[in-house]
Amino acid sequence: PKSRIEWIIIDDGTDKIEDLIESSNIPQIKYFKYDEKMSLGRKRNLMHTKTTGAFIVYMDDDDYYPPTRIEHAVKMLQTHPKALCAGSSIIHVHFKHIGKIVEFGPYGPNHGTAGTFAFRREMIENSTYDNDACLAEEKHFLKNYTVPFVQLDPRQTILVFSHDHNTFDKRKLLDN
């Protein structure tokens, strides 16, 4: 149920959203603001210290997540009890500058992009991100892709948006 979802927001942006959080009246939101810009690895590790749930499901602020995102990810972890982490090795990226959605992947059975991750609490008790990682942070967290993993349906997981402020310029994906 939605009442059991804990929303952790780590806000290190220049345009803080504290006013939106306060006016939302959603008690499950835990909002933490920081003046310094953080690397993705450090931000994800920090967020992990703020969570209390049995399952953690990522939802980055600049992508679209379907309404089925959380339910699908948790059910996949529940039906695959040996998997510590779930994610999608296939992603769909919307490129505004060309007006197209392009599919990338799959990259491997134990691979997923971090924005698609959902995992058991046990995962963060045994693994961390490289604090200095600004992109491709998944490899360290997934211990060189050896963590027991289950693939999620990409259409129930994420639609990535390519924009000028991405930590990685996703337009470079089109060069391959």
Question: Can you describe what each PLM-predicted range is?
Answer:
Residues R69-K100:
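Conserved donor NDP-sugar-binding/catalytic core segment of glycosyltransferases
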Residues D60-Y64:
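The conserved acidic donor/metal-binding loop of glycosyltransferases
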Residues T52-G53, H111-S127:
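Conserved nucleotide-sugar donor-binding
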Residues L84-A86, I98-F119:
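A recurrent flexible, glycine/aromatic-enriched loop bordering the glycosyltransferase active site
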Residues Y34-T51:
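Glycine-rich, basic loop-to-helix element that forms the pyrophosphate-binding segment
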Residues P1-R4:
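Short, acidic, metal-binding catalytic loop of nucleotide-sugar glycosyltransferases
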Residues I56:
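Short aromatic/hydrophobic "clamp" motif used to bind/position activated sugar donors
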Residues A133-F141:
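Acidic donor-binding loop at a coil-to-helix junction in glycosyltransferase catalytic cores
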